Amino acid sequence: MIKEAILKVVNGNDLNAKEAYGAMDEIMSGESSEVQMSAYLTALSMKGETIEEITASTKAMRAHCVKLLNDEEVLEIVGTGGDGSNTFNISTTSSIVISAAGVPVAKHGNRSASSKCGAADVLEALGVNIYIEPEKSLKILKEINLCFLFAQNYHLAMKFVAGVRKELSIRTIFNILGPLTNPAGATMQVLGVYDESLVKPLCEVLKNVGVKSALSVYGQDGLDEISVSDKTSVCELRDGRLKCYEIAPEDFGMERCSKEDLVGGNPRENAEITLSILNGQKGPKRNAVVLNSAAALYVAGKADSIEDGVRLASEIIDSGRAKKQLEKFIEYTNS
């Protein structure tokens, strides 16, 4: 299947769903050679991945991952990475705030790929045990509305392509697939993307793979988050329909900051930033967490609008509930 797919893509032709699924299935099964994987991923990247190809590839990758057998609706807040901005861990910090509001959050992430500090790195620096079994993660999710799904524990088939990705050192479809393949089958999602051209297509993919409510976002300053230093392009999925619009920090009573105000550092430094926000420190970094948390609270139906979500997220931080949630998370993962 992958040989035929390579030939088709090299000639600039799009794959149908069956062809794209088959090619990814071969890769995830370890049946493709490194040369075949390199050719396929490079050609696909040069042609440009279609919605149909991304949807089918997502389904194939999901079929090969270890699943968290969860029967409740959960939310994911995640960025594709690759924006080169080296911000602190906005979505990871936000996941603590969101879950403290009573929204079940299955945060899916990995160690750093394109920045100094990934979700796994900062959580580990905060004292969270990231190496726990799926059964225990599910138990913790049910008890405190929060769990962390360390990608390498769930996407075991990625070992077949890891070497190729490292050697290629170019953006491939896998940069997009990670955030689309939550092992808990998240049905609510805030997805940050690294390129404005992906905002609507990836929202369409989320719809195709069963997500019910979502925001796909791109900060126009280049962030794969909702930005507080520029406008943000948004595509919203609600009731099976897509709606695209822009939002700005001023819409929510926030001052624009400079992009540099959101820069983080190594895991220890980013852990300190997260703690300072949860301890109530004001400023641009807190605003970024509040606004991204607000969007997720809106997606989850805990707030009637992003504006209402801003009020709720602020109250959760100021009341100390978010800090207590982190303390519980550390305790539960280490007990």
UniProtKB/Swiss-Prot annotation:
5-phospho-alpha-D-ribose 1-diphosphate binds at residues 79, 82-83, 87, 89-92, 107-115, 119. Binds 2 magnesium ions per monomer. GO terms for cellular component: cytosol. Its cofactor is Mg(2+). GO terms for biological process: L-tryptophan biosynthetic process. Anthranilate 2 binds at residue 165. InterPro entries: Anthranilate_Pribosyl_Tfrase, Glycosyl_Trfase_fam3, Glycosyl_Trfase_fam3_N_dom, Glycosyl_Trfase_fam3_N_dom_sf, Nuc_phospho_transferase. One of its GO terms (molecular function) is magnesium ion binding. Pathway: Amino-acid biosynthesis; L-tryptophan biosynthesis; L-tryptophan from chorismate: step 2/5. Mg(2+) 1 binds at residues 91, 225. Its EC number is 2.4.2.18. Homodimer. Catalyzes the transfer of the phosphoribosyl group of 5-phosphorylribose-1-pyrophosphate (PRPP) to anthranilate to yield N-(5'-phosphoribosyl)-anthranilate (PRA). This is Anthranilate phosphoribosyltransferase. It comes from Methanobrevibacter smithii (strain ATCC 35061 / DSM 861 / OCM 144 / PS). The lineage of its organism: Archaea, Methanobacteriati, Methanobacteriota, Methanomada group, Methanobacteria. The gene is trpD.
